[in-house]
Amino acid sequence: MQFREWTKELFGRKMIVQHGKVAKQSAGSVWVQFGDSVVLATANISDRTIEGVDFVPLTVEYQEKFYAAGKIPGGFIKREGKPSESAILSARLIDRPIRPLFPKYLRNDVQLIVTVLSVDGNTPPDVTGIIAASLALNISKIPFEGIVAGVRLGYVDGKFVVFPTEEQLEKSRLDIVVAGSKDAITMVEGEAKEVTEEEMVNALMVAHDAIKQIIEFEEEILSQFDVQKMEIEEPKPNETLIGKFEEMISEEELRDKLLIKEKLERSAKLKEYRDQILEKIFEDVEMEDDEKILQESLLKEYFDERTKKLMRKIIIEEGIRADGRKVDEIRPITCEVGVLPRTHGSALFTRGETQSLGIVTLGAPMEEQIVDTIMEEGTKRFILHYNFPPFSVGEVKPLRGPGRREIGHGHLAERALKAVVPSEEEFPYVVRVVSEILESNGSSSMATVCSGSLALMDAGVPIRTHVAGVAMGLIIEDGQEVVLTDIQGLEDHWGDMDFKVAGTRNGITAFQMDCKVAGVGEELLKRALQQAKEARMKILDIMFNTIEKPRESLSPYAPLIVTIEIDPMKVGELIGPGGKVIKSIIKEYDVEISIDDTTGKVSIYGKDQKKVNEAIEYIKTITKDIEVGDVFEGKITRIEPYGIFVELMPGKIGLAHSSKLGEDSKNFKEKYKIGDTIKVIVVNIDENGRIQLGKTN
């Protein structure tokens, strides 16, 4: 295999692509360096066809290697284990733009592995992974129909920045990843700080121009390969059976069943109608069992295709959807707050047949989520988890940990709400939102945004305003384009685009798009985003009517957190030798304490207001400067011939000389014992900080 290398300057960084040096036994492999970030993409396909599946068996793995960032994995085991959430999200980011480009009938296992070998902190390896994946698949024998690329885009000081640095992203109002072909944008994922619809469209156009530049480089590379692609045999339905099917199917009957409003009833009636036709078709047909199974499967696909075409035709020609709505109409919405008596905040958001129960839990600063990835190190104080149990769609499946889809949906909703969450200075709590999807017929991630926003206000979290989300769809047929508002599952499955927009009344906070067709241009995006904005405003009105602003007080079951500031020089005194002082406070007052030794900020967390207040007063007492004239009720720790030593507070001991003990000066050794308490006054503090005490009444 010949070693080849290509280099191009792109967006202030050098991109180097190598082939034929490493992973030469893979069907396709490329080594891509962009800046100082390096990824290796390998693509392979199984020789065996998988029977009984009706989807492309593609697996995309994204491997984060800690050595890439010069780090050793944290924890007891110093080896990379199962993929982190960030790795799963990166795998999804690579998967989404490439999956639609595989042939529909590919039934061989395909595995794409993107391994991160080096990161520079400023060049995102996940986006580089999209470019590497496109190249690896195109130079392999794996059937793959297209060239894709991705970019990350920021918006700093009113200017769009392609592949922004970490420093620029901190100031940016926008952080989106956009992927696409030379002709169209096919995938968008990101968050924003209330950008307008116009700004978002402009961002997508800038991103697409950048994508075209990268694809030109990919085309230059791929022009030097003459690849023989593996042939996929497309199964052909029996023409005689298709003829019988056409004779038996009635468009009027199909329409009646398609336009049933309830999802489960519609699905059941369509299935019943399909099975009746299939049963009649195969009554007098003699064929091998394997062939019969195949033909049944193909006829089921044919039925689905007929139903899909009819759904799209009705939408285009009549402007009516399967559940009877107009194209720009949202489903009926109900909102409730305070539905769970003992949680810190809760809300039930129902939109048509999609329902999310949002729950908020408040925690202490020490309960922050630790983040340790190759790109990021620190903590998170706002967390959102999304759960999609099988009963939400009437299915039976084993309950295991969250899947990739759940992690992805939760991440999108978290990004949508993050824009309105108060700073730590305003609200010192760690905030966890959980969305339990109780039923689903599309757009459950956007229902999560709505239930989460309502639950945050119910919990008394001082969010600036409500955030709502809506999923939009698109039907393109014979040159006609119809944008659908608040799509349900059927429209998501059979439509041409699914894009989710979340935001406030002021602008967009999160955006996700997956497009199945080419040619979604600027004007169509503008129209779709404007329609989404109108829907969002209607949803926000309903949410504000339910709860207008955050509750003024927290739940009585929420923990109390009080933050005070002490002199950073006094932190050592508060902790004490070996943590003795702080441990005694925690035990005595049943509280948790976190200390920022740089700023001197002390957070006291507990469930009993009285004990929290007592702990605060005690901390203030032991960390304040002792001055002449201060009076203390101290404990005697030592008795010497010349006087007694009194502990005024932990670590602070003064001497009451016998001459300062008044009437007890002669018999103090008989009168006092170690452990007795005595009221004393500070009479002097010498230049060495030694405290001199006198007895006071």
From Swiss-Prot:
Pfam families: KH_1 (PF00013), PNPase (PF03726), RNase_PH (PF01138), RNase_PH_C (PF03725), S1 (PF00575). SUPFAM superfamilies: Eukaryotic type KH-domain (KH-domain type I), Nucleic acid-binding proteins, Ribonuclease PH domain 2-like, Ribosomal protein S5 domain 2-like. Residues 559-619 form the KH domain. Mg(2+) binds at residues 492, 498. Its cofactor is Mg(2+). GO terms for biological process: mRNA catabolic process; RNA processing. Residues 629-696 form the S1 motif domain. PROSITE patterns: KH_TYPE_1, S1. GO terms for molecular function: 3'-5'-RNA exonuclease activity; magnesium ion binding; polyribonucleotide nucleotidyltransferase activity; RNA binding. It is found in: Cytoplasm. GO terms for cellular component: cytosol. Its EC number is 2.7.7.8. Gene3D superfamilies: GHMP Kinase, N-terminal domain, K Homology domain, type 1, Nucleic acid-binding proteins. Keywords: Cytoplasm, Magnesium, Metal-binding, Nucleotidyltransferase, RNA-binding, Transferase. It catalyses: RNA(n+1) + phosphate = RNA(n) + a ribonucleoside 5'-diphosphate. Involved in mRNA degradation. Catalyzes the phosphorolysis of single-stranded polyribonucleotides processively in the 3'- to 5'-direction. PANTHER family: POLYRIBONUCLEOTIDE NUCLEOTIDYLTRANSFERASE, POLYRIBONUCLEOTIDE NUCLEOTIDYLTRANSFERASE 1, MITOCHONDRIAL. Belongs to the polyribonucleotide nucleotidyltransferase family. This is Polyribonucleotide nucleotidyltransferase. It comes from Thermosipho africanus (strain TCF52B).
